[in-house]
Amino acid sequence: MDKDKTNAMRLLDAKKIVYESFSYPPEITDGELVAAQLGEDEHAVFKTLVTVTDKGEHAVFCVPVCATLDLKRAAKAAGAKSVAMIKQKELEPLTGYIHGGCSPIGMKKRFRTFIDESAQNFSQIFVSAGRVGRQMKLSPADLAKYVGARFAPLTSDAEQTV
């Protein structure tokens, strides 16, 4: 376990939420390769995606790194007609995080957050710790409670995926 804490870790510490911290070489940018580097099931390592709805509201979705976000399912979960990925250049000003280091924990503003229901198949899942090269492992229930997330079916092999 690493001693160099990110803001996301400090926030969990403040709420006494149990997690483990892991590092990997920051030049590894592919989520499936990150899972392999950690020696973990790629279905248990989640990426954080930020979208905007047709109503102009932002929503956050956490899905396995080996899966794609089904935009229709995401819109349904968010109660919107449609959702679209934000532009990469909008990510840091909006969330405080850069691409590859976006955590669902500790964004500049609290956005509605949804976690793919498959997370409930694991006692613990991995999410970004808020810095490229850092991951943290925690209970999906603890993550959902902390960020106010709802579990929903968010992935499929549909054509409209990201």
Language-model features, listed with the residues they occupy:
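Extended, low-hydrophobicity, polar/charged segments
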Residues: 1-162
